[in-house]
Regions:
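Cell-wall polysaccharide-cleaving catalytic domain and substrate-binding groove, primarily
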Residues: 1-177
């Protein structure tokens, strides 16, 4: 079992449907659209914990490469996965790439990487170099930096669509940690 996925399921909880939430009905953090994309045809209230776990692990842990990042940094992988469940994997992956680029001392520590939202060998190498250079303190700073990006993302979402104002307090409280 993956404690990150278990924690996300515990945080997301059971079935929720709020008409103002553009994600629609969710259960265990899985939107109906995502469940359907995985072949689930039942009522969202009936989505099992095991089905949700499998979807979360595939879409928000393995596919984006956060499982590989966990071999370098468990805290960074947790932050990326948790954000991805809430907003998709592209943004957290791109934030990581952007932060690694600006933390590299103008390319003196390692070359800039292309910001494409895909975790590949260059992103992994940049993260490995950063962590070797900055250590545990740098790891904690990187997690804070990712949280800064996530908070800014939520602020922009709420400002663009006022229906999201009812969600932003909870997003900041539960997701920007």
């Amino acid at each position: 079992m993956n404690p990150i996925i278990d924690g996300i399921i515990a945080l997301e909880g059971g079935y929720v449907f709020n008409p103002k939430d553009k994600g629609g009905a969710t259960h265990w953090g899985i939107t109906e659209a995502t469940a359907r994309a995985h072949g689930y045809a039942g009522d969202m209230r009936d989505l099992t914990h095991a089905e949700a776990y499998a979807i979360l692990e595939e879409d928000y842990w393995i596919k984006p490469g956060f499982d590989v990042i966990s071999t370098l940094s468990w805290p960074v992988s947790f932050e990326l996965c948790d954000a991805a469940v809430n907003i998709g994997a592209y943004h957290p992956s791109a934030w990581l790439q952007r932060w690694l680029n600006v933390f590299n001392h103008e390319g003196k520590r390692n070359p800039d990487i292309h910001v494409d939202g895909n975790i590949g060998p260059r992103t992994l190498a940049a993260l490995e170099h950063y962590l070797a250079w900055r250590g545990q303190e740098g790891e904690a700073v990187l997690v804070k930096a990712l949280n800064c990006s996530q908070g800014t993302y939520y602020l922009n979402v709420a400002e663009k669509n006022h229906n999201n104002e009812q969600f932003i307090y909870g997003w900041i409280k539960n997701r920007v940690t």
